[in-house]
UniProtKB/Swiss-Prot annotation:
<dbReference type="InterPro" id="IPR052172">
    <property type="entry name" value="UxaA_altronate/galactarate_dh"/>
</dbReference>
<dbReference type="Pfam" id="PF08666">
    <property type="entry name" value="SAF"/>
</dbReference>
<comment type="similarity">
    <text>Belongs to the UxaA family.</text>
</comment>
<dbReference type="InterPro" id="IPR017654">
    <property type="entry name" value="GarD-like"/>
</dbReference>
<dbReference type="InterPro" id="IPR048332">
    <property type="entry name" value="GD_AH_C"/>
</dbReference>
<dbReference type="GO" id="GO:0046392">
    <property type="term" value="P:galactarate catabolic process"/>
</dbReference>
<dbReference type="GO" id="GO:0042803">
    <property type="term" value="F:protein homodimerization activity"/>
</dbReference>
<keyword id="KW-0479">Metal-binding</keyword>
<dbReference type="InterPro" id="IPR007392">
    <property type="entry name" value="GD_AH_second"/>
</dbReference>
<dbReference type="InterPro" id="IPR044144">
    <property type="entry name" value="UxaA/GarD_SAF"/>
</dbReference>
<dbReference type="Pfam" id="PF20629">
    <property type="entry name" value="GD_AH_C"/>
</dbReference>
<dbReference type="GO" id="GO:0008198">
    <property type="term" value="F:ferrous iron binding"/>
</dbReference>
<dbReference type="Pfam" id="PF04295">
    <property type="entry name" value="GD_AH_second"/>
</dbReference>
<comment type="function">
    <text>Catalyzes the dehydration of galactarate to form 5-dehydro-4-deoxy-D-glucarate (5-KDG).</text>
</comment>
<dbReference type="GO" id="GO:0019698">
    <property type="term" value="P:D-galacturonate catabolic process"/>
</dbReference>
<dbReference type="GO" id="GO:0008867">
    <property type="term" value="F:galactarate dehydratase activity"/>
</dbReference>
<keyword id="KW-0408">Iron</keyword>
Length: 523
């Protein structure tokens, strides 16, 4: 990230220029700035510009480059005078970087000095992983059983959990897959692998139980066996419930069967205790949603700094969201630790390009109305801000959707950019904590892992004071530095992972349903 230049007219009027070569800046003031506002460098606004939106720092000719983050984010539809507001309608989307010409592993970052002595209180698992929660996860093989599972979860919470105080909760791992799908299609590997690996998330302590219907395409046995690139889950048949089993006479018979199995697993989970673990055992997912023009200059760079701190501790950090990386991929492939990892990055980008082409769309469909209201002109500008979450470390591994990492360090886990789908896929990839930045605001949360939400703007942090865990808006006004907020986030991650602090999402019980990525046909 280049040095951020903050210019002000009065103590309450600022603009931020990210890179020396930028010919645009964003307005910081909560209510925007009015026409006639002057800055010490002679810039005068010729019209009102909303907060987060771009101002032309120079006269930009028609078809001229519009530059932010030191990169071309688009071309001017018409001549844009200095001091003008540049909204998305004035920016022509450039072509995506061609994949076959990108440099691979040409600027591999040197490892940063290791950080030692940082720990958290986690739950050690038999497979060597460490959880940050102690949850009973109830896996489902098909959506048909979701209503029954939800019913049973309520009974478990009411009648069983009070008997097992060391268990944090119970999660029905419902999804929309399992039947009415092309189960043998090549792309079916993605949802099957995802559901399989969700059940192995470290926060479920290795206790796997599966509820199926009986006639579904994704039979529990096939789900547990998984795909060629995963290890089969050795689950005793007593932990699988088929609702169509002839022994079930009436609904309550099904319920009692599930409750008996759940209690056996709760007894085992209740024996687990937190213990001191090195920070290297953490697996942290980084995500953004409801992004705005501040995301790439406040919250995401702070997350990137915290990411580097975690990598220096030996931890595993994942960033994702293919369409919010694709237009900045030329800045990531040089950071691949070797050419093989660089090629894997390109493979995932190309796979998603083809996936979008099949739907007769492209990456331009990514930005939402909220992104644009927050000052983002297009997916290029959004991507350049999004990758700031990755910090400066070398990328050591690339995962296809739902795969689990085999290395520690900075990892790219390919997922769609949808908040819910990305979160679900990262849970499958084994994250135990997630950091989520937002500029527009979202109550998003996950039951499986604690979600730390970071606001890009102070106005949002103040207005949603009991939903945003950390405020990065102080970076925009110069009250704090990226490094200071990054350290604050780092320590907060350790506290949340230890159970010493609860995220607002967990305090309020704001948890989204899982959304498994299924690129295969639905029949």
């Amino acid at each position: 990230m280049a040095n951020i230049e903050i210019r002000q007219e009065t103590p309450t009027a600022f603009y931020i220029k990210v890179h020396d070569t930028d010919n645009v800046a964003i307005i910081v003031n909560d209510n925007g700035l009015k026409a006639g506002t002057r800055f010490p460098d002679g810039l005068e606004l010729i019209e009102h510009i909303p907060q987060g939106h771009k101002v032309a720092l120079l006269d930009i000719p028609a078809n001229g480059e519009i530059i932010r983050y030191g990169e071309v984010i688009g071309y001017a539809v018409r001549a844009i005078p200095r001091g003008s507001w540049i909204d998305e309608s004035m920016v022509v989307l450039p072509e995506a970087p061609p994949l076959h010409t990108l440099p691979l592993a040409t600027k591999v970052p040197e490892p940063l000095p290791p950080l030692e002595g940082y720990t958290f209180e986690g739950y050690r698992n038999a497979d060597g992983s460490v959880g940050t929660k102690n949850l009973l996860g109830i896996t489902t093989s098909v959506h048909c059983v979701a209503g029954v599972v939800d019913y049973v979860v309520k009974i478990i919470e009411r009648d069983l959990l009070p008997k097992y105080p060391n268990v944090d909760g119970v999660v029905g791992l419902n999804h929309l897959y399992g039947c009415g799908v092309a189960i043998n299609a090549p792309a079916a590997v993605v949802p099957i692998r995802t559901i399989h690996n969700i059940s192995l998330n470290p926060n479920f302590g290795g206790e796997v139980m599966v509820i199926g219907l009986g006639c579904e395409k994704l039979q529990p046995e096939r789900l547990l066996t998984g795909t060629d690139d995963v290890q089969a889950i050795p689950v005793e048949s007593a932990s699988i419930v088929s609702l169509q089993d002839e022994k079930h006479v009436g609904f309550q018979s099904m319920v009692e069967d599930i409750l008996q199995i759940a209690e056996r697993h709760l007894q085992k989970l209740n024996q687990r205790q937190r213990e001191t673990c090195p920070a290297s055992e953490l697996v942290v997912g980084m995500q953004c949603g409801g992004s705005d023009a501040f995301s790439g200059v406040t919250a995401n760079p702070a997350v990137g700094y915290a990411s580097d701190l975690l990598v220096r501790c030996g931890a595993t950090v994942m960033f994702s969201e293919v369409t919010e990386v694709r237009d900045a991929i030329h800045l990531l492939t040089p950071r691949a630790v070797n050419e093989e990892v660089g090629k894997r990055l390109l493979e995932e980008m190309e796979w998603y390009d083809n996936y979008l082409n099949m739907g007769k769309t492209d990456r331009s469909a990514n930005p939402s109305p909220g992104n644009k209201k927050g000052g983002l002109a297009n997916v290029v500008e959004k991507a350049l801000g999004s990758i700031a979450k990755s910090g400066k470390s070398a990328i050591v591994e690339v995962l296809s959707p739902g795969q689990r990492p085999t290395k520690r360090g900075l990892i790219y886990a390919a997922t769609p950019a949808s908040d819910f789908v990305c979160g679900t896929q990262q849970v499958a990839s084994g994250i135990t904590v997630q950091v989520f930045t937002t500029g527009r605001g979202t109550p998003y949360g996950l039951m499986a892992v604690p979600v730390i939400k970071m606001a890009t703007r102070t106005e949002l942090a103040n207005r949603w004071f009991d939903l945003m865990d950390i405020n990065a808006g102080t970076i925009a006004t110069g009250e704090e530095t990226i490094e200071e907020v990054g350290w604050k986030l780092f320590h907060f991650i350790l506290d949340v992972a230890s159970g010493k602090k609860k995220t607002f999402s967990d305090q309020w019980g704001l948890h989204n349903q899982l959304a498994v990525f299924n690129p295969a046909p639905v029949t």
